[in-house]
Amino acid sequence: MLSPQRTAAVASRGAGDAMENGKPGPVQVVLVHKEQHSFELEERALASVLLQDHIRDLDVVVVSVAGAFRKGKSFILDFMLRYLYSQKEHGHSNWLGDPEEPLTGFSWRGGSDPETTGIQIWSEVFTVKKPCGKEVAVVLMDTQGAFDSQSTVKDCATIFALSTMTSSVQIYNLSQNIQEDDLQQLQLFTEYGRLAMDEIFQKPFQTLMFLVRDWSFPYEYNYGLQGGMSFLDKRLQVKEHQHEEIQNVRNHIHSCFSDVTCFLLPHPGLQVATSPDFDGKLKEYIASEFKEQLQTLIPYVLNPSKLMEKEINGSKVTCRGLLEYFKAYIKIYQGEDLPHPKSMLQATAANNLAAAASAKDIYYSSMEEICGGEKPYLSPDILEEKHQEFKQLALDHFKKTKKMGGKDFSFRYQQELEEEITELYENFCKHNGSKNVFSTFRTPAVLFTGIAVLYIASGLTGFIGLEVVAQLFNCMVGLLLIALLTWGYIRYSGQYLELGGAIDSGAAYVLEQASSHIGNSTQAAVRDAIAGRPPADKKSQ
């Protein structure tokens, strides 16, 4: 954190470190350490731009261009610079200027290797007065090309997410078409940003523009905004027969951005792409239809009436505030709280499974502490109460864990977690029940009681001359005795567990029926006593 004195000193120096010979230039504000795949905020450089006296308290408009490397992002940004400088100096409509003038600004060149690393902003912040009379600060942002040979998916996701989180207009620069993998990458990157912002229930980002470069099908969809919007509507359309994953991608994009647009831009010309000597002069190489569409695209993005201030949580952000958000966001991505992105499908599944496993472990550990292996028998009512308490604790942990995929995607994993917790609870109940002394000796007690009762009944019936009934009781005594001996052997040897389970179930059924009959008789006797009536057996006398 910069002290007030240091902040003032940094701001008073302006963007001197980023300028050569007193001229504005690009300033590196997020540095990528490619070997360590880590990120560093150049706080001094960022402060030198955003804390200049004349703009620090103005609401800021941040226009960012992001996308795959070597697709002309810096090239487009330099035309934006030309437009802004033209409006600053004289404001006439011919902002493209002298056709003999080379294109300067953000570093760009033809070739196959990326030119920009990390995130850069232009050192001069433009002040623009909107039609309503409000003055705003306009910042242009350039990003590292995604998916170069040295960048991991996490590198790309972090850079794209940071630029999207801090910009009011994110231009997604694509080549030739909007492919399905472009949408999936966008879903992954924006979800990575939404995780860091803790935005779940509202749209965390503002404007997304798909800028499709080198559009080759003007006979299907015209160049420009109108053709682009028609093309985008078709590409992002959600249909019933589509696979769930494809539907989720489209729903996710609409849920993340308040406004989504598309602009189709023609190829600038073959010589622009192939000539090593091209320096951006409009007179040379650049196709007329490309220049024509540029004169529509750039004013559409930067016209004072179109400028949209950066908002976070519904509040407009000043240049001073943007610096603080940069510092807060970079700390999140430097930490270990966020999941490591792989692909959207892998990341969401693995991340949610990990969160569910962690929550399940919390429940299991908590229950083990009160009714685990060596813990004494616990009352079923207390066990149920603790189950509900620890279940809620586990669910709260799952909900609070940062997860990819959004609330709807995570809900199915929450349901699975609840089912697994229920299974664990049933196992804990069985284990707890086995600790009950009466439960342990329930089966032999029932069998022994049955043997004793039947033996006495056999003697009585034999005494009064009912030999057949007495022999029947004796047979039943023999069967119960065999069952008792068998149960004891099974308990001792651990064999024939199914037969032992059947004997236990039979004993439990007999005990349940006897208890139910005694309970009903007792309740009836109590009711009769309260009502002042004689018991049913006395009535019959």
Swiss-Prot record:
Keywords recorded for this protein, A-Z: Acetylation, Endoplasmic reticulum, GTP-binding, Hydrolase, Magnesium, Membrane, Metal-binding, Nucleotide-binding, Transmembrane, Transmembrane helix
EC numbers, comma separated: 3.6.5.-
Residues binding GDP: 70-75, 109, 213-214, 272, 275
Substrates-to-products reaction catalysed: GTP + H2O = GDP + phosphate + H(+)
Domain of life: Eukaryota
Membrane-side (Lumenal) residue stretches: 467
GO molecular function: GTP binding; GTPase activity; GTPase-dependent fusogenic activity; identical protein binding
Gene Ontology biological process terms, A to Z: endoplasmic reticulum membrane fusion; endoplasmic reticulum organization; endoplasmic reticulum tubular network membrane organization; Golgi organization; positive regulation of endoplasmic reticulum tubular network organization; protein homooligomerization
Topological domains annotated Cytoplasmic: 1-445, 489-541
Annotated membrane topology: Multi-pass membrane protein
KW Magnesium (keyword) present: yes
Region entry Disordered, spans: 1-22
Subunit composition and interactions: Monomeric and homodimeric. The homodimer, transiently formed by two molecules on opposing membranes, is the active form mediating ER membrane fusion. Interacts with ZFYVE27; both proteins are involved in endoplasmic reticulum tubular network organization. Interacts with REEP5; both proteins are involved in endoplasmic reticulum tubular network organization.
Record note on domains: The GB1/RHD3-type G domain mediates GTP-binding and hydrolysis as well as homodimerization.
Protein name from the UniProt record: Atlastin-3
Top-level taxonomy: Eukaryota, Metazoa, Chordata, Craniata, Vertebrata
